Design a protein with these regions (language model features):
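Conserved, well-structured ligand/cofactor-binding cores
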Residues: 15-239
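Intrinsic-disorder-associated, low-complexity terminal segments enriched in Asp/Asn/His/Tyr and depleted
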Residues: 9-12
Length: 239
């Protein structure tokens, strides 16, 4: 209806480039991503925190200490050690195996906000991913390259595993994305934007699919629409 589809930008939500730092961002500043692309950039502090967390991960790998999801299997296979030569394949297999969603795609606005929320998580500096993983999220947002993500099938045990796996597929150049008003293979959209897909390294597949970014994006959309309804009710009551 008109009440829930009218532009949230008319509620005086801020526009322009959104800075992603280690600080939290209010839902009012995030809701405009539901309506269309907004440029983003990482703060110097966020970039540094991402670099430092990646250094910690590299040190762990050098010590050969067994760390779950980094150099072990997952779930019941958590005690199984994975050799260094197989770490990349482990992360790739994780993403592919969890890309099992079904049904109609998520709304583009929800997908866009989902990417922003994942970027915000990385900006905190706790994930261990390489800076290029976070930068690809920035570039995909700024080119509005949005992975096609089925809305059903999330496991929910460790967050929104299935939908986030579909997001990760777009980042590795697999699956389809929405780009320039068309649905194309992810590799084509990346190539046309002069971007390269990432090759997942230790822990990166796990860090991409673990999280509640889809649930939070849907929650923000519900909150924004409730705000519109509340303001509309206030106006109607004043007539």
């Amino acid at each position: 209806s008109l009440l829930v589809t009218c532009s949230r930008n008319r509620l005086n939500f801020p526009m322009g480039t959104q800075l992603i730092s280690q600080e939290s961002i209010s839902w009012q500043k995030l809701a405009p991503f539901l309506d269309g692309p907004i440029r983003v950039r990482l703060s110097p502090g966020a970039k540094n925190s991402i670099r430092e967390s990646n250094k910690v991960l590299k040190q762990i790998l050098k010590t050969k200490r067994k760390v779950y999801g980094v150099n072990t299997g997952f779930g019941k296979l958590g005690n199984v050690s994975i050799s260094v030569k197989d770490l990349k394949q482990l992360q790739l297999n994780l993403v592919r195996s969890h890309s099992c969603g079904i049904g109609k795609p998520l709304d583009l606005g929800v997908t866009r906000l989902m990417l922003v929320l994942k970027l915000m998580t990385y900006a905190k500096g706790y994930s261990g991913v390489r800076p290029k993983v976070a930068q690809l999220l920035v570039d995909m947002l700024n080119h509005d390259i949005l992975p096609i993500i089925p809305r059903k099938g999330s496991v929910g045990a460790s967050g929104d595993l299935a939908p986030l796996a579909h997001m990760a597929r777009g980042m590795i150049g697999e699956g389809d994305v929405h780009f320039q008003d068309r649905i194309v293979p992810a590799m084509i959209a990346l190539k046309e934007s002069n971007l390269n897909p990432i090759v997942l390294e230790a822990k990166e597949g796990l860090s991409l699919i673990n999280g509640t970014q889809v649930s939070v994006a849907l929650g923000i959309r519900s909150l924004a629409e409730a705000y519109i309804l509340l303001k509309t009710a206030d106006i109607s009551g004043a007539l």
